Amino acid sequence: MSDEKAVRFAHWVFLLAGIVGLIEVTPLLFLENVIGVRQPPPITHPEFYYGFVVIALTWQIAFLIIALDPARYLPLLPVLFLEKLLYPIAVFVLYAQGRVTAQAFPGPILDLVWLALFVTVWVRLRRWRPGNT
């Protein structure tokens, strides 16, 4: 893959990650009660719920910023790997313990797809540095 294609690919991956993430996460700000009804019991610690939501929203904005200049933010990508890996691990452990059902899997599985794309971006961009020909 050429340098220009690697950067363009990275741009689109992070732009889409940010947009999709904002579309998925923003409604959670308004769904606390709905979640409590559809997946009892109700949320008993709203500070944890909203803390999770606003941190997730913050990362989506970070993805949009990274999309503007992916090569510049290359050193940050391993941290993004953790952001996309740790939640699925937590959900799969909770499932193994019988504390959540498979209904909790779509979000973590999507995170693993984004993880694969982020790793692909990292591998491709590491071969390229601005100013190299």
What are these regions (language model features)?
Residues 77-91, 107-118:
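Hydrophobic alpha-helical segments of small multi-pass membrane proteins
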Residues 19-28, 44-68, 79-85:
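Core segments of alpha-helical transmembrane spans in multipass integral membrane proteins
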Residues 29, 64, 92, 119-122:
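Membrane-embedded alpha-helical segments of multi-pass transporters/permeases
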Residues 37-46, 75-79, 99-110:
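Non-cytosolic membrane-interface motifs at loop->transmembrane helix junctions
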Residues 6-46:
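Membrane-helix boundary elements
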Residues 113-133:
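Membrane-water interface at the C-terminal end of transmembrane alpha helices
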Residues 1-7, 132:
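Short, Lys/Arg-rich, polar N-terminal cytosolic tail immediately upstream
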Residues 88-106, 123-124:
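Membrane-helix boundary connector in multi-pass membrane proteins
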